[in-house]
């Protein structure tokens, strides 16, 4: 009896098939193009990066964006490849970018490895929470898009505007600065708040306020006692919709908030998250708006 030998061809996974097809078509470049281009081949990852692309009048270059890229409103008409920290290689490859402009922290690393293997040029834009940091972002994006001169002019103007806003805030006496608690979430009745080293900490200081919490870095859940002890004059939250919205009414029901000056006075400021924390082209205006909300015109 003879045995029949069956040869099986390995089945290509969707990702391998897409990657192979893309490479065979030569759609991916190996480096950012020099000189301004008219082709739509750029994927923008991160709300501030996308804002910068539009501010440089390079939106015609965009082929897609990530979920955090919601301004200007017309950006939301672009294909959405997902949240910047949870990108799938398939989603990115499906829009066939030649260049990815990304804020720091995009990932996961496995996805970035696949994109590098595909020969996609990836330019990572550092995240810093000051005027010079915004200028660096703009100049790096401009250089990658071949519009360095335009980027330098935009960066210089924004640095000047933000430094002027900061000078006005610096003139406020320390004793007159309001203590501000930035609350990211109140899920389960527990307050997730900003310490130091965050965009929230920086924007509060630039607007002339004082972060009520400086005992830790980043974002952490705080005990009720710690929140009450922080004694914020104002609660600052992102303006959200639906189940994630934090309202003055919901905050007033929390035992940690009620005894604080902010709780007693119902002092809650709500601002759009990207506008408030993006540290991009609109940040000088956001600083001025937050300062007005804290102290009046």
Regions found by a protein language model. Name each.
Residues 16-28:
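Bacterial N-terminal signal peptides
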Residues 2-19:
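Bacterial N-terminal signal peptides that target proteins for export
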Residues 108-117, 234-252:
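A ligand-binding cleft/hinge motif common to bilobed small-molecule-binding domains
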Residues 90-96, 118, 223-231:
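Short helices/loops that flank or line small-molecule/ion binding pockets
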Residues 40-111:
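A short, structured surface patch at a secondary-structure boundary
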Residues 194-219, 239, 269-270:
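His/Asp/Glu-enriched short active-site or ligand-binding loop at hydrolase and phosphoryl-transfer sites
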Residues 34-41, 110-188, 213-215, 266-297:
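Extracytoplasmic substrate-binding proteins
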Residues 46, 104-105, 127, 216-219, ...:
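Short secondary-structure boundary segments
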């Amino acid at each position: 009896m003879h045995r029949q030998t069956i040869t099986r061809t390995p089945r290509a996974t969707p990702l391998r098939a897409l990657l192979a097809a893309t490479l065979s078509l030569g759609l991916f470049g190996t480096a950012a193009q020099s000189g301004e281009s008219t082709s739509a081949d750029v994927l923008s990852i991160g709300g501030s990066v996308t804002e910068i692309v539009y501010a440089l009048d390079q939106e015609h270059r965009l082929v897609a964006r990530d979920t955090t890229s919601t301004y200007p409103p017309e950006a939301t008409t672009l294909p959405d490849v997902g949240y910047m920290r949870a990108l799938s290689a398939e989603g990115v490859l499906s829009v066939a970018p030649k260049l990815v402009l990304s804020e720091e922290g995009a990932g996961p690393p496995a996805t970035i490895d696949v994109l590098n293997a595909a020969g996609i040029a990836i330019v990572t834009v550092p995240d810093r929470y000051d005027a010079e940091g915004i200028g660096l972002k703009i100049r790096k994006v401009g250089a990658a898009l071949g519009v360095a001169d335009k980027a330098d002019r935009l960066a210089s103007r924004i640095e000047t505007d933000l430094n002027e806003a900061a000078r006005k805030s610096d003139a406020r006496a320390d004793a007159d600065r309001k203590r501000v608690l930035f609350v990211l979430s109140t899920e389960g009745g527990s307050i997730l708040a900003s310490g130091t080293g965050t965009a929230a900490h920086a924007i509060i200081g630039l607007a002339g306020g004082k972060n009520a919490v400086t005992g830790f870095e980043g974002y952490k859940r705080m005990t009720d006692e710690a929140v009450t002890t922080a004694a914020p004059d104002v609660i600052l939250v992102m303006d959200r919709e639906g189940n994630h919205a934090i309202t003055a009414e919901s905050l007033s029901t929390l035992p940690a908030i009620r005894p604080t000056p902010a709780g007693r006075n119902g002092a809650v400021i709500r601002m759009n998250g990207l506008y408030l924390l993006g540290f991009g082209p609109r940040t000088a205006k956001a600083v001025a708006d937050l300062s007005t909300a804290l102290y009046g015109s």
